[in-house]
Amino acid sequence: MELSAVLTPAPEGGYVAFNPETGTTTQGETVEDALQNLREATELYLEEFPLSIVGRPLLTSFQVPEHA
């Protein structure tokens, strides 16, 4: 099953990884670490809450005005 991952640099270093389909969030020192941790956290989540029960969210984008 292919799922989404959103990785954001953490202010204190490393990366925060988020899976929008399940809401699982974790972190890691490198992109690879963060993705591996997210994979493990998401697998554990899906054992209890399969996507067939939870459903998939609608991912879209929106715009906000830029401020100087």
Each predicted region: which residue ranges?
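Short aromatic-glycine-(Arg/Gly/Cys) micro-motifs in beta-strand/loop hairpins
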Residues: 4-21
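Short acidic, gly/pro-rich beta-turn/loop elements at beta-sheet edges
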Residues: 15, 27, 36
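A short, exposed loop/beta-hairpin motif centered on an aromatic-Gly-Thr core
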Residues: 22-32
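Short, charged, surface-exposed hinge/linker loops at domain edges
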Residues: 1-4, 32, 36-68
